[in-house]
Amino acid sequence: ALSCQDDDFTQPVISFTASSASVNTQYQRRDQHLRSKDFFDVKSFPNITFQSTSLEPNHINGDFLMRGILGIRGIEHEMTVDVEYGGTMTDNEGQMRCGFSLYGKISRAAFGMTWNRPLACGGVLISDEVRLQGNMQFILKQ
């Protein structure tokens, strides 16, 4: 959901809730493991949440930096994501739409997801750093 206190989009609030069981890597065995207690523990923690706290212009590239609180497995941490504004348009039905792309990184261990497996050649199977990417489209509510 997106809400704004004003028409010029200077103070937007973005929040979302996603089902942790909706994880889909296109590989069923891996998805089942990701839904287990080793990772998302979807039976105990069915939702992933995000609530923005601020949106500021990114003077480096002209887009935005959004700060907010991400909740996974009942653990909340502040995070910052890069936001690219994709544009605004009126669709064929006369509805105003705007699009955004989001990019960020988190530590999965910070959210209690520490499972890993050592590799024979050294190192571990899974990186702690997880890159997040998402696309959003909003429709102006009349």
Where are the model-predicted features located?
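Low-complexity, acidic/polar, glycine-enriched regions of mature
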Residues: 1-142
